Amino acid sequence: MINDQLPRWVREARVGTRTGGPAMRPKTSDSPYFGWDSEDWPEVTRQLLSEQPLSGDTLVDAVLASWESIFESRLGSGFHIGTQIRPTPQVMGFLLHALIPLELANGDPSWRADLNSSEKDLVYQPDHKYSIEMKTSSHKDQIFGNRSFGVENPGKGKKAKDGYYVAVNFEKWSDAPGRLPRIRTIRYGWLDHTDWVAQKSQTGQQSSLPAVVSNTQLLAIHTGGQR
């Protein structure tokens, strides 16, 4: 049962419906989900989100403003992305990663972009425990990490993989014939480093999330279209 004392955006955040994916790794004792049944994980996530200084409404506004500004910007001799230029999904994701921290900092200077590889993508300067990792993907409902996310790798200078995450899924050009691609889903929540599962092959380059983790620990705060 959802606690009616939580902020509206937290109460309205939606559990996912994905199926399949890799088998889940065990939770460790330092996980906020440790000892809870997976049926209770959405409420654990809601509690974690209610403690975040960055509200879901502010985050959604920053993501959508960043996405829109990609298409409004002029490059070279007046060229526009979406008209003369169609970047790869990797480049579109890079632009989101660059713009979202700037949009947030413009409204609240407590936030800034990372300055080195040991910091999260979105740094909350008053208290780094609220800093946020961003994941973007042109997949319809999944996000991916480097293979290192799914293996024990506490190497020097590596950023912590436990903590708050925002996941942004956007359309590819081929998904949007005759129009500009849109943001599919913005999800917000918490992931532990053990939630990531590396590809079994040693040559595989990706890690992914089991469906139960994706559905219950990353809750949808925006789905479909623009503002």
Curated annotation (Swiss-Prot):
Catalytically driven reaction(s): Endonucleolytic cleavage of DNA to give specific double-stranded fragments with terminal 5'-phosphates
Any one GO molecular function term: type II site-specific deoxyribonuclease activity
Pfam families in the cross-refs: RE_ScaI
Gene source species: Streptomyces caespitosus
Signal peptide: none
GO annotation (BP), single: DNA restriction-modification system
Region: Disordered, residue numbers: 12-35
Membrane-spanning residues: none
Assigned keywords, A-Z: Endonuclease, Hydrolase, Nuclease, Restriction system
EC numbers for this chain: 3.1.21.4
Record-annotated disulphide pairs: none
Coiled-coil portions: none
Name of the protein: Type II restriction enzyme ScaI
